Amino acid sequence: MKKYLFIVLLVGVWSCEENKIIKQNEDEDNVVVLDTIRFTQLTNLFRNQCYQCHSEEGFSFYGLNLDSYENIMVGSENGPVVIPFKPHESLLYVKCTPEFIENSSLITGGDRMPKENESFFDNNPEKLQLIYDWIMGGCLE
């Protein structure tokens, strides 16, 4: 009986690990384990904060549409907006961070996003973390 209980527990633990991404940090000797974030987990955030200026239905500033995975991966007139596994080099993340105003010349000019509610991510850091985790996890569809 103990043997079967052990096997059931082992299978349970193993199946939970499928929802994790393990990424070796190239600069350090540590391993980062992230929950798997998929684009569908970001659609409500983008719809509520970004679509009015960055969608095919609304307006498309700089040719950036955040209304589909394919459009995000295409990027904008300024080039890519996400670089998988590199949130600090991805405009989609960087332009939403509080540090963007201080370091905007490092990547691009312009305003912090969302433009109509620049403090949104200050008040909702878990939403910014979701974008970070999605990019760090490889921008999964």
Model regions: which residues?
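Sec-dependent N-terminal signal peptides
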Residues: 4-12
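Aromatic- and Gly/Pro-enriched helix-to-coil junctions and flexible linker segments
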Residues: 16-141
